[in-house]
């Protein structure tokens, strides 16, 4: 992990990644000035920062491995999934998904959840729901359900 962090000297971290909240980690992933995000367009950032966080924690890979994938190009499937995404609503949908894991009522509360706890809950709650083509359908259904309320 330390070796990986040192490979991004243009973005010094104020505290260890696993002591950050979900909100703080998301801010780093969406920061316009960070080394990682300069390589991505806004749609790709939204897709990777939230979608990949779910994907890699669900598959129980280490956070360092997840972060290293930020440097890789998107697969054709990922490009298709991120194409045409409205950034604010996509981010809101993913945060609402976070909220559902914790049975919370506000996104503000979800953003304060420690990232380490979030990853543990994801591992325990959705380990059987491997990231797949169906995952976007599940998110879309949740989004429609939320809009109806």
Feature roles, as predicted:
Residues 1-144, 149:
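An amphipathic, hydrophobic-aromatic interaction surface with interspersed Lys/Arg
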